[in-house]
């Protein structure tokens, strides 16, 4: 008796504009198939920087952790799901977009969070901590389908904890490269967040002056933040997990350029010197 209603509900989550979220950019201005043109195609940077960082960080991943490849794949999935969401403004697209972000942050936690920040009951065991993070993320994922606001609370909680860790580590370090990376990461993230909030809160103003691109600017800035954030976490992790090795920061395409994507090279310390 309930099958037709269930089918209608399932089909509705795939439908165009079935999400309650609608960004400032006018819909279907450039194509009948793409709801938000600039918000959709600005995600292409996720698909560029993801594979590029996998290539640049390959030596690091081979020596430290191959989980880096999984983190990069999740980053690219965020770009794909975000493209799908902004193309359709469907409820399913919204869920996939938000859940993929949650899993990216969770995977970063599992791989790079220093053991000194682990809960005491896991006793510094990264495997147990990763299991705890995975179980929590799975529960949050299922709850998101029941109550979508759960994911927003989860993401905000993680963001607050990350800021706390960044502040704590920044106070402890003396390495100029790491301090620079943390500063740039925070500035990029703050600029991206400002664009995101401004698009939501001041939409009527931006529409009056015909400037609809703040959310697409958020996509570009946050995709650039990813390489800086990854390298920052790798350097912090190395301080705790690889004290016998030195990580040298390089920038693609050239170290001498003012702007570039950071990556690290692991160097063996010569203990005979």
Curated annotation (Swiss-Prot):
Which subcellular locations apply to this protein?
A: Endoplasmic reticulum membrane
Segments on the Lumenal face: 1-36, 148-149, 199-215
Q: Which domain of life is it from?
A: Eukaryota
- Cofactor(s) in the UniProt record: Zn(2+)
The entry's description of pH dependence is:
Optimum pH is 8.0.
What GO molecular-function term can you cite, just one? metal ion binding
Q: Provide the binding site for Ca(2+).
A: 22-23, 25, 27, 36
Protein's membrane topology? Multi-pass membrane protein
Q: Write out the GO cellular component annotations.
A: endoplasmic reticulum; endoplasmic reticulum membrane
EC number(s) in its UniProt entry? 3.5.1.-, 3.5.1.23
Which keywords has UniProt assigned to this entry?
Calcium, Endoplasmic reticulum, Hydrolase, Lipid metabolism, Membrane, Metal-binding, Sphingolipid metabolism, Transmembrane, Transmembrane helix, Zinc
Give me the segments passing through the membrane: 37-57, 73-93, 94-114, 127-147, 150-167, 178-198, 216-236
Metabolic or biological pathway, per its Swiss-Prot or TrEMBL entry:
Lipid metabolism; sphingolipid metabolism
- Known catalytic reactions: an N-acylsphing-4-enine + H2O = sphing-4-enine + a fatty acid; N-tetracosanoyl-sphing-4-enine + H2O = tetracosanoate + sphing-4-enine; an N-acylsphinganine + H2O = sphinganine + a fatty acid; N-(9Z-octadecenoyl)-sphing-4-enine + H2O = sphing-4-enine + (9Z)-octadecenoate
Q: What happens when the gene is disrupted?
A: Homozygous knockout mice are viable and fertile, with a normal lifespan but display several postnatal skin phenotypes. It includes an increase in total ceramide levels in the dorsal skin, tail epidermis and dermis. This is associated with hair shafts and sebaceous glands abnormalities, cyclic alopecia, a progressive loss of hair follicle stem cells, hyperproliferation, inflammation and abnormal differentiation of the epidermis and results in increased transepidermal water loss and reduction of fat content during aging.
The entry summarizes how activity is regulated as: Inhibited by sphingosine. Inhibited by Mn(2+), Zn(2+), and Cu(2+) in a dose-dependent manner. Slightly activated by Ca(2+) in a dose-dependent manner.
Protein function: Endoplasmic reticulum ceramidase that catalyzes the hydrolysis of ceramides into sphingosine and free fatty acids at alkaline pH. Ceramides, sphingosine, and its phosphorylated form sphingosine-1-phosphate are bioactive lipids that mediate cellular signaling pathways regulating several biological processes including cell proliferation, apoptosis and differentiation. Exhibits a strong substrate specificity towards the natural stereoisomer of ceramides with D-erythro-sphingosine as a backbone and has a higher activity towards very long-chain unsaturated fatty acids like the C24:1-ceramide.
Instruction: Report the sequence similarity comment from the record.
Output: Belongs to the alkaline ceramidase family.
Q: What is this protein called?
A: Alkaline ceramidase 1
Originating species: Mus musculus (Mouse)
């Amino acid at each position: 008796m309930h099958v037709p209603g269930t089918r209608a509900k399932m089909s509705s989550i795939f439908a165009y504009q079935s999400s309650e979220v609608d960004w400032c950019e006018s819909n279907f201005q450039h194509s009948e198939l793409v709801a938000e043109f600039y918000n959709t195609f600005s995600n292409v940077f996720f698909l560029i920087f993801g594979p590029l960082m996998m290539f640049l960080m390959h030596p690091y991943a081979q020596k430290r952790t191959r989980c880096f490849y999984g983190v990069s794949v999740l980053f690219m999935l965020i770009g794909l799901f975000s493209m799908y969401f902004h193309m359709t403004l469907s409820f399913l697209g919204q869920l996939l977009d938000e859940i993929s972000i949650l899993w990216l942050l969770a995977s970063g936690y599992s791989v790079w969070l220093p053991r000194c920040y682990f809960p005491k009951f896991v006793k510094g065991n990264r495997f147990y901590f990763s299991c705890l993070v995975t179980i929590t993320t799975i529960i949050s994922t299922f709850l998101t389908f029941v109550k979508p606001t759960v994911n927003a609370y989860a993401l905000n909680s993680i963001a607050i904890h990350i800021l706390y860790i960044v502040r704590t580590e920044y106070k402890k370090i003396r390495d100029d490269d790491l301090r620079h990376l943390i500063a740039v990461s925070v500035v990029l993230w703050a600029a991206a967040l400002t664009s995101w909030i401004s698009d939501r809160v001041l939409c009527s103003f931006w529409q009056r002056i015909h400037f609809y691109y703040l959310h697409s600017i958020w996509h570009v800035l946050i995709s650039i933040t990813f390489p800086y954030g990854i390298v920052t976490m790798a350097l912090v992790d190395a301080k705790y997990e690889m004290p016998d090795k030195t990580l040298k920061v390089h920038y693609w395409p050239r170290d001498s350029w003012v702007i570039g994507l950071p990556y690290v090279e692991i160097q063996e310390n010569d203990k005979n010197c």
